[in-house]
Amino acid sequence: EEYRRTTGRDVTASLEGNRILLTSRGLCAHSCTPFNGKNAIVAILMFLDGLGIDGSMGAFLRFFAEKIGMTTDGSLLGMKREDECGRLTFSLSKMDVDEDRLEWVVNIRYPYTYKDQVTADFTAQVAPAGMVMDKVDAHNTYRFPMDHPMIRTLRGVYEELTGKDSTPGHEGGTYAQVVPGIVPFGSIF
């Protein structure tokens, strides 16, 4: 209760037999808007870092707390980027730990103009901590110029009908991998 009150993170520890059970409650958010959520995995990592654990797990926890923490923009890693297509978002989406290894899956949505730089920047940050990027699953970024006739037409019609700003977002990457030429646009995006 003290931890929750002082940090705002909903993490509890309880004893069940000879095991300690950590429970963290978060708030789900899409990986393109992680700042709208509360990452339960990250909250547990920050809790564990506060315990002063030794060894390789302790080194990982310290790295995570210092270089990532509760941020969702890559700023502690020196990777904060933004362009006309949007800003970089960074979210830890999965973690698997056993006696021999720790695997973590990070979802990084990066601005169009920084696509080649992001993987190199992240690799450079994790290497000194003894970590290796085992797999990089990078999708090609996707962009339509704002002055493209289709974009101008869609924006004009949308604004006329709704009275709302129609500036396209940088979401929709999943759709763009499947449907060439799709534009993240309108109230759904």
Could you tell me what each predicted segment is?
Residues D98, P149-F189:
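Zn-dependent metallopeptidase/amidohydrolase metal-coordination segment
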Residues G17-L21, F63, D134-H148:
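Short proline/glycine- and acidic-rich turn/helix-capping motifs at secondary-structure junctions
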